[in-house]
Amino acid sequence: MRANGSELNGTVLPRDPPAEGSPRRPPWVTSTLATILIFTIVVDLLGNLLVILSVYRNKKLRNAGNIFVVSLAIADLVVAIYPYPLVLTSVFHNGWNLGYLHCQISGFLMGLSVIGSIFNITGIAINRYCYICHSLKYDKLYSDKNSLCYVGLIWVLTVVAIVPNLFVGSLQYDPRIYSCTFAQSVSSAYTIAVVFFHFILPIAIVTYCYLRIWILVIQVRRRVKPDNNPRLKPHDFRNFVTMFVVFVLFAVCWAPLNFIGLAVAVDPETIIPRIPEWLFVSSYYMAYFNSCLNAIIYGLLNQNFRREYKKIVVSFCTAKAFFQDSSNDAADRIRSKPSPLITNNNQVKVDSV
């Protein structure tokens, strides 16, 4: 091992990560990685700012469920503001030359973002489950005060989950991905715990919640007497599908990296040499790319967000104040009770993600 370098598998990091020591690659590889990062940063920043502004401006989007959506957008913004630009700099310089402190902060914020994202996605799934499957208790469970407390709890748990990395020494520079990140080979037991509590367990909870919702949706749609039986509004079903797609994309983007980490933790000496570099790098940049997808999904699948996006862009282009409330029509001022169920005689309008 070089005295001033880090091992290829990311097991050792000196106090000051060097610029040299990154693997030599064809120019098109680094160009591709840089392009992916630039696209991710730009779309992440613009998209998630649009999400936050949309909820701020539109009363129809200001509800308990969307508090978690804003929290998720903040988690995605974190990486676009600090860690990803540093990774991009590392790509351009073919190595890390920003020092030990920036390496640790970058790795910490990257972990904070991903754990915050999965915990917020779990919070959204539980919220949707209560909203659709336990609608009579929803107002009490998800009052404005309670919802803010839930989001606060999510971020407290996120910080608690990431802090041990600072003491275990697992935040290290890996030249293969030009990033200071969680080193999977530092401790097998710790890596297994991270994968289980930060990925597998949340995914299991979210899967359970959405499975129960799908079962209810199928049961409701098969009922033969709609006059007496409640049915799910199409609007609520579309909102559920939106958040389900967000979950599926997160799971797909992050699963390869987590399964690689699990395999490395089980048998590091055997697995590490067998993992192709292209697979390892692809799994990381696939995970990085996920941070810019949610805002796109909201715009594609949610009509309220799509309309608000357009209003914000028009306001910006015409130099109007885009921080003002855009909910001016009479329908927007009607405060409706959130409930996913309606009958033929009693329709309830709901506007949420």
From Swiss-Prot:
Localization (cell) = Cell membrane
- Glycosylation is annotated at N4, N9
One GO BP annotation of this record: G protein-coupled receptor signaling pathway
Q: What is its main location?
A: membrane
Provide the GO MF annotations for this entry. G protein-coupled receptor activity; hormone binding; melatonin binding; melatonin receptor activity
InterPro entries the UniProt entry points to: GPCR_Rhodpsn, GPCR_Rhodpsn_7TM, Mel_1A/1B_rcpt, Melatonin_rcpt
Which segments does the topology annotation call Cytoplasmic?
54-66, 127-145, 212-243, 299-353
Which superkingdom, per the lineage?
Answer: Eukaryota
Q: How does it sit in the membrane?
A: Multi-pass membrane protein
Question: Where in this protein does the record put region Disordered?
Answer: 1-26
> SUPFAM superfamilies, alphabetically?
Family A G protein-coupled receptor-like
GO CC terms, sorted: plasma membrane; receptor complex
Keywords of this protein's UniProt record, alphabetized? Answer: Cell membrane, Disulfide bond, G-protein coupled receptor, Glycoprotein, Membrane, Receptor, Transducer, Transmembrane, Transmembrane helix
Belongs to which family? Answer: Belongs to the G-protein coupled receptor 1 family.
The protein here is known as: Melatonin receptor type 1A
* Lineage, broadest ranks: Eukaryota, Metazoa, Chordata, Craniata, Vertebrata
